[in-house]
Amino acid sequence: MSNESTNCSFFLNLFMLLLLLIFYSADACQRECGGISIPYPFGIGKDCCLEKYYEIECRNTTSRKLVPLLSFINKEVVSISLPSADSHFAYEVSDQERHESFGLVRVKFPITSAGCFNDGKESGGGSKMNFTGSPFFIDRSNSLIAAGCNSKVSLMYIKPKMVGCELSCNTSKDSYSNSIPFVEAGCSSNVLPYSQDQGCPEEIAEETGCNGIGCCQASLPNEPQQVIGIRTENNDGNSTTKVECTVSAFLTDEIYALPKATKTEHLLAKRYATVSLGWVIQTSNRSFLDSLALACKDREDYRNTTNLERKCTCGRITISETSYANCGCTYGYTGNPYVLNGCKDIDECKVKFEYCGKTETCVNFEGGYRCVRDKTKAIMIGAGTGFGVLVLVGGLWWLRKFLIKRRITKRKKKFFKRNGGLLLLQELNTREGYVEKTRVFNSRELEKATENFSENRVLGHGGQGTVYKGMLVDGRTVAVKKSKVIDEDKLQEFINEVVILSQINHRHVVKLLGCCLETEVPMLVYEFIINGNLFKHIHEEESDDYTMLWGMRLRIAVDIAGALSYLHSSASSPIYHRDIKSTNILLDEKYRAKVADFGTSRSVTIDQTHWTTVISGTVGYVDPEYYQSSQYTEKSDVYSFGVILAELITGDKPVIMVQNTQEIVALAEHFRVAMKEKRLTDIIDARIRNDCKPEQVMAVAKVAMKCLSSKGKKRPNMREVFTELERICTSPEDSQVHNRIDEEEEEEEEEEEVVTTINRGDSWSISVTAPALSIVASSPSSDVEPLFPRLTW
């Protein structure tokens, strides 16, 4: 028993080895000839094919081109295809129809003709195609094509008994209708030009591809045919004249459309037509079929079972009463079923056809595919929606920001125009060559420098606005003057300050760094003067600054006089400050004076001696002659400087209260009265009385008296004042102090003096004995506000 078992195992292993040799025999053979693939069971040479019917001869032509020939019929091969090779991607067909397809080999057959003459001899008729006993048959993809005149072409040896078409070159309507191919109703399901089989009582016209006069075609029946002949009959029985190339008829798998083609020499010049031959496997090849049975499943069993693991199936088919085998790859596979593992999986997810819906993901597996609803797609859709909403919100936010920025830009342009930007440009252009380029700051830069104009940054309040301390991005400390809300009538004052400061380049005048006109109220940027204003150092009660001794005060007076002298005579055009006061005198780190606040300044031409304007100024500093005439001259600045000299000498504010009375008088009047009564020592500031040089103080006091003269003509100009004060300051000995101005006691003025009487009351009002003129004054504090009175006459 064991010996028999051993023998069976041996023969089984030997049989499997032989099968493997059979299947892999093709691998060692040439599989291409002339660029045409030669799949198994075909092969080049006897040892590389299944049997003689599949032998291919690779012949070298005269043009040195390799041409494959099917040795069995000695015809040139155009292509060889495997079963189902063209149907695996046509997934709309059923599995049964797919596996009933056959392998095809396309070969070249000569075009046959009848009734043609070449060199005086009539060419032979068409030959019969006979593949009986071979594994080949004529595929139904071929058609009968006929071209010529007055002929009837039909196929022989097929069922139904007669299939063909008629040719006519007559252009009449009746003859044209006869040339159209037709099929008899109730006969074949295939569209045939005509049939004369029994049971087909009527003929129905059916248009086909070649339906013009002189051309017709007919389709083959569905059943595989191994024998086909072509018969041509002449329908023109009365004609005795032979015409050249009457009929050309042939089988081909190509498409022809030859309307009105009556000359067949063009077809004969082609010499051949391609014909598709189906091929199967003869059942006499038992060993080969048995080997296929191990790899492929029987087709009937495959259709009746749910086990679809096999990659290929084989079935039997009868052709001309002979049984053949036909194999093919199963659904989901493609390749050569006649080679071991020749059927390969199709990746349906990579083909162009969409198998799954938009919300599904295609997943390929061996022999098929499945559509999986992607759970991540919902997340992706949600994320995409969220991202879209985010983009939308971001877009709206950006649009809002853009619109706000655009609105701010328009507002800035509006403010620039309203704040006199155009006027400033015009003024600067008219003074081109004399005006240094002024930097234009943007509002954001100044907001950042002043911490958004914080109250903690306020340095002081002036007549035209508030001054803030700020720091620029480059580290420079600046003073930002933010003007008050002003009407268009006051814009000229602001622009005037910018233009004037742009012209000035003097060490004792505050330097203008730039301006900003794009805000609701205009702003100026000055250099920052660290020690504040002169008023604070002289008049604040808690101030006992030792630096404000007489020597420092005298030097400050010289600095102020030098600056005013420069403005009146040395600048590009004379400039009248019009608001000289101690709060507008700033002290730097070395306590050197700098003149500031040019908001009410005016520039005049050289030939002008005064400027007629509405009265403006600060109580206690305004020239009384200016009150009367409304004409501001350089001597008006001299008068205001005289008040500052009186402040430096006495330490009193420009408006003082008379002791033991309710009256408030101007310091200028009080100083003049004391000088006339020779009581200077009584009014000298107690803080400098013991330290000063009396001769210097007296000399400066006499200069102040001249500056405070009620008549402008009797006042010296600022150059004379500066020269005199500088000489007083630099005199090494007290005996050398000499007043250039006459030291003789002035004659008592004949003209009517303007006497200022200030009654102290709840309203702190001031009445001035001037022609029908009244003004309102601010409280005498460190925050002295300029007044803008108007003449009422």
Curated annotation (Swiss-Prot):
Residues 733-757 are annotated as: Disordered. Its main location: membrane. It is a single-pass type I membrane protein. It is an enzyme of class 2 (transferase). Residues 1-28 form the signal peptide. The modification Phosphotyrosine is found at Y526, Y626. Disulfide bonds join C314-C327, C349-C362, C356-C371. Its EC number is 2.7.11.-. PROSITE patterns: EGF_CA (PS01187), PROTEIN_KINASE_DOM (PS50011), PROTEIN_KINASE_ST (PS00108). It is found in: Membrane. Keywords: ATP-binding, Disulfide bond, Glycoprotein, Kinase, Membrane, Nucleotide-binding, Phosphoprotein, Serine/threonine-protein kinase, Signal, Transferase, Transmembrane, Transmembrane helix. Residues 400-793 are cytoplasmic. Residues 742-754 have a biased composition (Acidic residues). Residues 312-371 are annotated as: Atypical EGF-like. GO terms for cellular component: membrane. GO terms for molecular function: ATP binding; calcium ion binding; polysaccharide binding; protein serine kinase activity; protein serine/threonine kinase activity. The chain crosses the membrane at residues 379-399. It catalyses: L-seryl-[protein] + ATP = O-phospho-L-seryl-[protein] + ADP + H(+); L-threonyl-[protein] + ATP = O-phospho-L-threonyl-[protein] + ADP + H(+). GO terms for biological process: cell surface receptor signaling pathway. Residues 453-728 form the Protein kinase domain. ATP binds at L459, G460, H461, G462, G463, Q464, G465, T466, V467, K481. The active site is at D579. Serine/threonine-protein kinase that may function as a signaling receptor of extracellular matrix component. PANTHER family: WALL-ASSOCIATED RECEPTOR KINASE-LIKE 17-RELATED, WALL-ASSOCIATED RECEPTOR KINASE-LIKE 21. The EGF-like region is specific to this family of proteins and seems to consist of the C-terminal of an EGF-like domain fused to the N-terminal of another one. This is Wall-associated receptor kinase-like 18. The lineage of its organism: Eukaryota, Viridiplantae, Streptophyta, Embryophyta, Tracheophyta. The gene is WAKL18.
